[in-house]
Amino acid sequence: KVEDNDELRRIIDSGDFGAWRIFLHPQQREYAEKSRNGSFRLSGGAGTGKTVVAVHRARNLARANPRARVLLTTYTRNLADDLASQVHQFSGAQTVKRLGGSGVYVSGIDQLVWAIMKRARSGIADAVKDVLGHPREDPLKSSDVSWDQAIDEAGRILPAEIATTAFFEAEYETVILPYRVTTESQYLSVRRQGRGLSLSRARRMAVWKVVAAYRSAGRAEGGTSFAERAAIAAAWLERTGQHLFDHVIVDESQDLTPAHFQLLRALVAQGPDDLFLCEDSHQRIYGQKV
């Protein structure tokens, strides 16, 4: 552990890049070490050390309780691999490969979803119905259905600003999936807070026709999209009440979707140090504001 500026100077002079990557400035130590009564969000700009805080916090929680199950996750597999390599920089620190095992489990969010659905096996069927309204032959199979196809089939009456893949992807991921909307009547009454574009009843009905076409094609194909799998995994965890982790730490949380957050919430029971989110709200690349 780097204790002060003199230690930082020693690291710089020695050229120890590994130590530099996990250098924790004294001003950051509170966030890495302080116990919280519940969930906590750490927000800061690029280069403020949020990732280092996340890595140190995961390691500290695992050291404080060797039986603790600690999840360290982020949006992409590459970022997760980088987090794992930083954890391994600590003397004697290791990551675990088994989902729900004691220690620090590092994974990209989509890989985490996959592991949860593999764990659920046939028990995932009810969760699929909760989210999509109908079963899928192989929920782990990646779907090739596109929104462009559904719009061409059922969205010809929609105005140009709505008849786009970008609109439907966002509507699906921020409204339909997290609220588990499976029927037109549900969609006509669901809240669309934060979407920035109001829809009349007639427009909602027209939008739903496209969603129905998209889901019908997905059902015929038998697979699911990444976004659908995240919502399905969250629904399964909620159904079973399985809390696979004691602590969940998220790096780059600004890039996650509402279904991802539902998943993370379901992974850990509410309590001390349950959820710790590190975000840069000015660098939202993939997700939408939650």
Named regions from a protein language model:
Residues 121-203:
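ATP-hydrolysis module of ASCE/P-loop NTPase motor domains
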Residues 2-21:
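Conserved adenine-nucleotide phosphate-binding loops and their immediately adjacent elements
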Residues 17, 21, 25-69, 75-130, ...:
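Conserved helicase motor core of SF1/SF2 NTP-dependent helicases
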Residues 46, 184-190, 221-231:
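Short coil/turn segments at secondary-structure boundaries
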Residues 167-171, 209, 228, 232:
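Amphipathic alpha-helical interaction segments
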Residues 186-191, 195-196, 201, 231, ...:
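Extended, charge-rich low-complexity regions and/or helical-solenoid scaffolds
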Residues 7-10, 206, 210:
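Extracellular cell-wall/glycan-interacting regions and their flexible linkers
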